[in-house]
Amino acid sequence: MPNYDKQFYDDIRETSRHAARTIVPMVLELIGPVASVIDIGCGNGIWLSVFREHGAERTFGLDGGHVDRATLEIAEGDFKAADLGQPLPIAGRHDLAMTLEVVEHLPKARAESIVDDLVSLAPIVLFSAAVPGQGGEGHVNEEWQDTWAERFERRGYRTLDPIRPKIWHDPSISWWYQQNLLLFASPEALAGNPDLARVADQTDRARLSVVHPRIFVARHKFLVQINRKRINLVKELAELQAKYDALSRSNDPTEN
């Protein structure tokens, strides 16, 4: 995991809070109220604090030892430092488990076992992970959404895509949530919630792996700029080569 510092968390604090306050009510409208939530890679706990605003009585977060306890937005006793690259040192069951833009920082060898951890923790998982080419500090395993869905589905969980369509066109929400945010639900969760089961039935499994236009356009502009610089450098190099060749000929006595 990268060593994120206080400045990193300060920079993302309010954008994360806004996203959480927009998305959490959507999640709860679908799955119903939750008493307990666990966040794997919780950072300073902003998402957990928003779940508490919406009635969660018990929240717990895990992240690396780099997290400054002074920045936590949950009680320090609700946070545990852990190496997320290893099987999680926790047990117990919660109403909801979540991990948002975290698993891309873990080695590919950890991909299967992190899903094992998540399904052991809750019947419903809120999940977001970087796709190939997304880029970011410390990303070592970017995979498509349907690859992660297959992992959950092998463990009996179904894939739900109810949130992305609701936030897709909202420019105030960070594009990585617009692009990557999915829910996974166990048979027990679906059996007790007809609305949840209906969303699972309606989810278009073939359209999970997508790239948001905001990042596509940004990457395209960047590549155009790089290509322009390349063209200019090639032109300058050709001009320098021509000057060098001319100078070499002028100093070559055999040319006189």
Model-derived features with residue positions:
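A short His-aromatic
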Residues: 105-106
